[in-house]
Regions:
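Short S/T/G/P-rich N-terminal loop/turn motif that feeds into the first structured element of a domain
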Residues: 9-184
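Bacterial Sec-dependent N-terminal signal peptides
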Residues: 1-11
Length: 184
């Protein structure tokens, strides 16, 4: 669910994971049964704004098929990994519900929200780019696309642009935009 995912957000992290098909059911069970409750606890206690587990539909990458989005008001909240302790929250040892052994690839990126229009939606398109002029790209999105979408979302229910804060290397994107829709 993408609804309101970035409401009041200033920062977000995306954890990309590659889960082999034979591990998907157990991965989804552990994430939706246990880790979603840890995230809910963090949201209710003001440690983050939102959490989402999404699966990829189509696309050109074979390096990930699931992603976690954690949304925060501050960079300090985003950096505080101590809040992800299922032992203190659920009374369950982290090793009992770990999904690390079910994945064959993992990567985390951290982002700053530069502009967004809130709304609901069950599906999203993520666009990753590495523009030659990052500042101009963000400025164009803030001053041209944001106001244009405020007038006519063109079927979108949510839109935004974020700047990457880590993994800034030649082969990686430095910016992403997202467009949410009611369904795929």
């Amino acid at each position: 669910l993408i609804a309101g995912l970035f409401l009041n957000a200033q920062y977000y992290s995306i954890s990309f994971v590659n889960v082999p098909q034979e591990n998907v059911a157990e991965f989804e069970r552990l994430e939706t049964t246990y880790w979603s409750k840890v995230a809910k606890h963090n949201i209710e206690n003001g440690n983050q704004i939102n959490w989402g587990l999404v699966s990829r539909v189509g696309g050109g990458s074979d390096t990930w098929n699931y992603a976690f989005i954690n949304v925060y008001e501050t960079a300090e909240q985003m950096a505080d990994v101590s809040v992800w302790d299922p032992k203190s929250i659920l009374g369950i040892d982290p090793e009992e519900i770990s999904t690390n052994h079910l994945t064959v690839g993992y990567g985390v990126t951290h982002w700053s929200v530069k502009a967004s229009i809130q709304g609901s939606g069950e599906a999203a398109v993520w666009n990753f780019a590495r523009p030659a002029n990052l500042a101009a790209f963000i400025d164009e999105n803030q001053k041209l696309w944001g106001p244009a979408f405020e007038k006519d979302m063109g079927g979108r229910t949510n839109w935004g642009v974020g700047q990457k804060l880590n993994n800034i290397e030649q082969q990686y994107s430095t910016v992403m935009t997202w467009d949410s829709f009611e369904s795929v």
